[in-house]
Amino acid sequence: MNVKQPTDDELRFIAAEYHLDLSDDDLASFQGLITGSLAAYERLHELTEPKPEVKYPRTPGYRPEPADNPLNAWYYRTSIKGAASGPLAGKTVVIKDNVCVAGVPMMNGTSALEGYVPDTDATVVTRILDAGGEIVGKAECESLCFSGGSHTNENGPIRNPYNPAHTTGGSSAGSAALVAAGEVDMAIGGDQGGSIRIPSCWCGTYGLKPTHGLVPYTGAFPIEITIDHLGPITATTADCALLLEVIAGKDGLDPRQYDVKTEAYTQALSGDISDLRIGIVEEGFGWANSEADVDASVRAAADQFAALGATVGAVSIPMHLDGQAIWTGIATEGATMLMVKGNSMGHGYVNGDRIP
């Protein structure tokens, strides 16, 4: 039997922990209930787990030599060609190494996972291939994606293509670096607290953290379900909208997705923006660790929207000042439950091999 029937002594021990005193009749009653439940669990154990089809042939690829990987941005290189036609036909795409690509090694920046090879594709991977894109490899990321720098990866720091002595930002460090260097057209990144946006800013690419739940996270290594996001990193806004159009929408598998509404994002790239209102958060500027020229650059970029006809104005969100503290609590507690106790599988996960 997959799960063994508890003994009466074990039931008494559990009951005592809850300050319950069970009679022999109580124990017999509970044992009867448990027997019926265990039969159901035994049947569940016998059922074959359905797995999404791996639709496109591929090889595991290879780990590039340092001479061919000067930014240390590639984890693995491969070539997985998708459909013969589609909106991404002719586009090369690299996938952040916290996202599963069947048959291709994945370590999520840490030696703890080195040697792991997924046997299914993440939903975003399947959608990219169905749209005609070619996946050309996995991009290095920070250790378990828990850094906004580019220095915690087990294989060494990921270097900025504009100045190798500078950080790329993280945790989607390799994704942004490879796009900025022109080695790929597009990348998939992940974002829990800036991990698409930070490296995109520091590498001069376009990165978008989509609305929560818009893009399915199915098949990606999580941190906490309320802050997990996958999104595009590209060299142009047009490609950013195009990739988002391909990967957005429900997949019926991701509990992060609820009332998902997709749009034709590429059609929103031109036209009148006079009805667009943009708020500049006052509390986002002037921090002790802020740089004045960066603050000025952000405000200048906002002014460009005003010049194009949008309404741009200051807004105050005082709680923004506590955002990092709030995020730290959510991410730490969530990661403990989901990544550590849940083995990245979810709350209440139990490894069947450990059940006596």
How should each PLM-predicted stretch be described?
Residues 1-88, 246-356:
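Amidase signature
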Residues 21-192, 303:
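Gly/Ser-rich catalytic/binding loops embedded in alpha/beta enzyme cores
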Residues 121, 205, 295-299:
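Amphipathic alpha-helical segments in well-structured domains
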Residues 143-145, 195-196, 288, 322:
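Generic structural signal for helix capping and beta-alpha/helix-loop junctions
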Residues 159-173, 213-220, 336-351:
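Short, basic, helix/turn surface patches
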